[in-house]
């Protein structure tokens, strides 16, 4: 009797639009289509890293319930329009940008002054309508984050963020707009009780649908690998866990598992960084001192770690484990 579970052998990606794609995976054992489809959908909607405006300061505005002379929209609608802008930061985690325009005319996202490493994916997005004599002058802070973070739960310790007139926004960082999945019947040879998983993914352009599902799958693997590493221990007089058993198994995986570019991987190995646990303890400044490792490689490393819920500069008390091989 067949005891091994089938794994999908056919994975196809069909682009429906520039930011929408249909991903088909088959065959799965009966029931696994719903199991994996629902898990992937939840991760895609909640755990992808993206960018969003988080704070706004508008000249002449003290709070969000104000109005501006010569501006058709009130401040509440201005803020809603700002949250509809799709930003993409290339080499930083946050940036403050300026928007200044005088009427009459329409204010769109392309009127924002941007540094060279910041991109707006929907430049024609309308922000406001100005009449003759109307003027709009604002500063917008854009940050990198994950999921949805309401403004009232964000914590600020910097006094500069508490000045009057600075408005904190609810931030929706997720680059994934919509995800749906369907499970169809599949057949392999004489077996007709199998599943085919069909997922339709739409993003805002910051991330391609194919890259989104790849990152979601990687997040699931990294979360579940902890359970795969569970070991049964015999009862003994010493019940204290060993030093190596306290370390997340994911941190003991080689940096090759991060699938970095050859250049980045070679730079890390030259610095004796062989495991993910070695890497996350390094700071950005330390890595930038590595020969041949520039800002582009650093950003690649940060993005790959962020997709796994990790970051540079982390502290590990139980590293390295005693049984770790170099």
Swiss-Prot record:
CDD domains: RNAP_alpha_NTD. Residues 247-326 are annotated as: Alpha C-terminal domain (alpha-CTD). DNA-dependent RNA polymerase catalyzes the transcription of DNA into RNA using the four ribonucleoside triphosphates as substrates. This is DNA-directed RNA polymerase subunit alpha. Homodimer. The RNAP catalytic core consists of 2 alpha, 1 beta, 1 beta' and 1 omega subunit. When a sigma factor is associated with the core the holoenzyme is formed, which can initiate transcription. Its EC number is 2.7.7.6. GO terms for cellular component: cytoplasm; DNA-directed RNA polymerase complex. NCBIfam families: PRK05182.1-2, PRK05182.2-5, rpoA. Pfam families: RNA_pol_A_bac (PF01000), RNA_pol_A_CTD (PF03118), RNA_pol_L (PF01193). Belongs to the RNA polymerase alpha chain family. GO terms for biological process: DNA-templated transcription. The N-terminal domain is essential for RNAP assembly and basal transcription, whereas the C-terminal domain is involved in interaction with transcriptional regulators and with upstream promoter elements. The keyword Plastid does not apply. Keywords: DNA-directed RNA polymerase, Nucleotidyltransferase, Transcription, Transferase. It comes from the Bacteria. Residues 1-231 are annotated as: Alpha N-terminal domain (alpha-NTD). GO terms for molecular function: DNA binding; DNA-directed RNA polymerase activity; protein dimerization activity. SMART domains: RPOLD. The lineage of its organism: Bacteria, Pseudomonadati, Pseudomonadota, Betaproteobacteria, Burkholderiales. It catalyses: RNA(n) + a ribonucleoside 5'-triphosphate = RNA(n+1) + diphosphate.
């Amino acid at each position: 009797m067949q005891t091994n579970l089938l794994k999908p052998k056919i994975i196809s990606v069909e682009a429906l639009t520039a930011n929408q794609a249909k991903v088909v995976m088959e065959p799965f054992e009966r029931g696994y289509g719903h199991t994996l489809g629902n898990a992937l959908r939840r991760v895609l909607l909640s755990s992808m890293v993206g960018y969003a405006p988080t704070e706004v300061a508008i000249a002449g505005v003290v709070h969000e319930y104000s109005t501006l002379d010569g501006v058709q929209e009130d401040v509440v609608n201005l803020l809603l329009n700002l949250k509809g802008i799709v930003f993409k930061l290339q080499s930083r985690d946050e940036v403050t940008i300026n928007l200044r325009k005088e009427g009459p005319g329409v204010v769109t996202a392309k009127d924002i002054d941007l540094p060279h490493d910041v991109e707006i994916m929907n430049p024609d997005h309308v922000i406001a309508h100005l009449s003759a004599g109307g003027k709009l002058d604002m500063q917008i802070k854009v940050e990198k984050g994950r999921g949805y973070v309401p403004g009232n739960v964000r914590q600020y310790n910097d006094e500069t963020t508490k000045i009057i007139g600075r408005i904190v926004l609810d931030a929706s960082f997720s680059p994934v707009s919509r995800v749906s999945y369907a499970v169809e019947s599949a057949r392999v040879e004489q077996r007709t009780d199998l599943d085919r998983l069909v997922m339709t993914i739409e993003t805002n352009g910051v991330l391609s649908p194919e890259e989104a599902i790849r990152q979601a799958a990687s997040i699931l693997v990294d979360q579940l690998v902890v359970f795969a590493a569970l070991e049964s221990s015999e009862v003994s007089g010493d019940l204290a866990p060993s030093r190596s058993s306290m370390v997340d198994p994911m941190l003991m995986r080689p940096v090759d598992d991060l699938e970095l570019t050859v250049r980045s991987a070679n730079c890390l190995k030259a610095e004796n960084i062989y495991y993910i646990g070695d890497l996350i303890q390094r700071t950005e400044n330390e890595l930038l001192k590595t020969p041949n490792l520039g800002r582009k490689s650093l950003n690649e490393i940060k993005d790959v770690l962020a997709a796994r819920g990790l970051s540079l500069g982390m502290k590990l008390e139980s590293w390295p484990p005693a049984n770790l091989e170099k």
